[in-house]
Amino acid sequence: MTNWFNKLLLFYFFIWPPLTTSEQSDLNDQRPPENRFDGEFLDLDFDEFDEEPSWRDNFVIRVSHQIFGQVNSHQVEPIPDFKIHKSASIENHRTGINVRYQNAIAPGWLIQGSWQGRIYWKEDYEYEANNNRIEDEYRINEIFVQRSTQGQSFRLGRQTVVWGETVGNSVLDVINHNEFRDFTIIDVEDTRLNQWMLLWDVFDKESSWSTFINLYPEFNPRPIRGGPFDFDLGYEINPVDRGNDPIFEIGSQWRRSYGSSDISVMAAYLYENQLRYERPIFPSDKANPVKNDYILIGFSANRAVRKLLLTLDVAMKRGVLIDGSTFVGVGSYNTPTNVKKDQVGISLGFEYGITNYQTVSLGVQLKKMKDERAGLSEEQVLSNQGVYGSWLFRYGNRLKNDDLELSLTLQGDLEGEAALLAGNAAYKINDNWTAGLQILTIHTNGTSELQYYKSDVRLGAALAYSF
């Protein structure tokens, strides 16, 4: 653990950006993308607020109902000679309400927040995990107050900070933690969880400096009880021990525009979002989660060439733990929790506007650990060796005057052992009603950790009312 003196030096380094006296041209363009509601797979556009003064104008409310399940009865063999029959079943049967609030309470002042509630009905995995009783859940997703002045902006509250240029697959998108609950949410943009932060932006005509401070870092939550990613480990897990030393995260990013290009340089002191776990010695004991702090140095750039946007992200991490399980939200139980390494990661991508209504993008992420075998015994096997990573392909099309939106997502690992295909369609019936369909299938080869989901086919439908 980095000692307190080093943390204090890092705090001083990150919090003191260069001064500027130029006016801010457009504060809204500098804001990071808003965290989407958990469980949403419809790409819905909220109506603009009415200009007439009314308390109701500051709210947007959406009520939705969703059914989603695995429809292909088949057999899988996650372990050699161990076969499991999988029957078609409903996984998600739930009603949701999402509330978004935004109010410019005074010149230069903004309050924004979002809240969600869920009711889990019969056949939903959370209903079954709750002893076959209706379950409900409520939480605040985002809430912050922002103060904007000439050339500066301060924002305090639960929010997200996103670094990197490669959409959906950037090695720099590591600040906020994530939660993959089930297969209705596969895009990283939809999985980011808000954290309590102070964000300070300083703007110049062609450049900006952004600094964040997180005084209570959080970690990727364990898979939801009863969900498709929840497996019986044979023992319980202790809560995170934050210890007596202060735990915080801090980072800064400098960004500059050069005509059709942008470059960014960033540095941060962070905690790994994914915990590792120490396997208990006795079955009656609980596993202890291991948190780890590290230093991130990054660089990103983009270049626009007519309808084509090229992106590059580079991340150098010093003092990260060995990558173990690649399974979402699970972490690792079989790799050492006391061996730190340095890692280099690169993301390459492009986005292309085929027409005003069609877009396509591709992002590739590559990682490499330095001296990955150093400090390990011959018996210890690494899940990821050499250069490893993932790829992500997306296609989007808007039809019928934007009333029908179609999207296709393909993603997999570089080794070719696993691939996921998802298709979505959202139809705007009128100004209030929207209907959506989703299909998702998984294909695996070799020793992929997704063998349990091999040949799964999932279908879903949702109906939403917004006002």
Describe each model-derived feature in a short phrase.
Residues 61-71, 113-119, 156-158, 211-215, ...:
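Transmembrane beta-barrel strands of outer-membrane/channel proteins
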Residues 59, 107-111, 151-154, 206-209, ...:
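Repeated loop/turn-to-beta-strand initiation elements of outer-membrane beta-barrel proteins
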Residues 395, 439-441, 454-467:
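Outer-membrane beta-barrel "beta-signal"
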Residues 93-99, 138-143, 194-198, 248-252, ...:
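Hydrophobic, lipid-facing positions within transmembrane beta-strands of outer-membrane proteins
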Residues 66, 270, 299-411:
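Detector for outer-membrane/organellar transmembrane beta-barrel domains
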Residues 16-90, 96, 100, 187, ...:
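N-terminal periplasmic/intermembrane-space "pro-region" immediately following the signal or transit peptide
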